[in-house]
């Protein structure tokens, strides 16, 4: 059986539209660069789709495994407690989802963290501001 990866890009959500726009755009960039991957964005609170609705969005896509990636810079309570609880992950960041009557493995990625690519982006934003 051919593996088909799904990516769940997780945003915090906000009453304002900006967080949703950014997370959705990042998910769209990933989907365009990796056309063989199914990408969905979901939000913890104050934005739609919710995480549950985003997971439902994998129905009919044929995904055989899903990576959930928090689009957050650093770990905090949402990353270490809330999202793992919502996704029913074990202590190793693993779990399963039922999609189209099949059990699909789910793994939890780290937040973005400190990375040279982010440092380059910060410097780019500084240059744009000057």
UniProtKB/Swiss-Prot annotation:
SUPFAM superfamilies tied to this protein: Chelatase
Keyword Lyase: yes
This enzyme's EC code(s): 4.99.1.3, 4.99.1.11
UniProt catalytic activity: Co-sirohydrochlorin + 2 H(+) = sirohydrochlorin + Co(2+); Ni-sirohydrochlorin + 2 H(+) = sirohydrochlorin + Ni(2+)
InterPro entries, alphabetized: CbiX-like, SiroHydchlorin_Cochelatase, Sirohydro_Cobaltochel/CbiX
Pathway(s) where this gene product acts: Cofactor biosynthesis; adenosylcobalamin biosynthesis; cob(II)yrinate a,c-diamide from sirohydrochlorin (anaerobic route): step 1/10
Family statement drawn from the similarity comment of this UniProt entry: Belongs to the CbiX family. CbiXS subfamily.
Protein task: Catalyzes the insertion of Co(2+) into sirohydrochlorin as part of the anaerobic pathway to cobalamin biosynthesis. Involved in the biosynthesis of the unique nickel-containing tetrapyrrole coenzyme F430, the prosthetic group of methyl-coenzyme M reductase (MCR), which plays a key role in methanogenesis and anaerobic methane oxidation. Catalyzes the insertion of Ni(2+) into sirohydrochlorin to yield Ni-sirohydrochlorin.
Subunit structure: Homotetramer; dimer of dimers.
Protein name according to UniProt: Sirohydrochlorin cobaltochelatase
Organism: Methanosarcina barkeri (strain Fusaro / DSM 804)
Gene: cbiX
């Amino acid at each position: 059986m051919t593996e088909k990866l799904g990516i769940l890009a997780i945003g915090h959500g906000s009453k304002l539209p900006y967080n949703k726009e950014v997370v959705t755009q990042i998910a769209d960039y990933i989907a365009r660069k990796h056309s063989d991957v199914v990408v969905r964005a979901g939000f913890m609170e104050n934005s739609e789709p919710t995480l549950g609705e985003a997971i439902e969005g994998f129905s009919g896509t044929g995904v055989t495994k899903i990576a959930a990636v928090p689009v957050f810079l650093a770990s905090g309570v949402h990353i270490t407690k809330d999202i793992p609880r919502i996704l029913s992950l074990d202590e190793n960041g693993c779990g399963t989802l039922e999609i189209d009557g099949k059990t699909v493995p789910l793994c939890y990625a780290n937040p973005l963290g400190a990375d040279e690519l982010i440092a380059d982006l910060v410097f780019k934003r500084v240059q744009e501001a000057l």
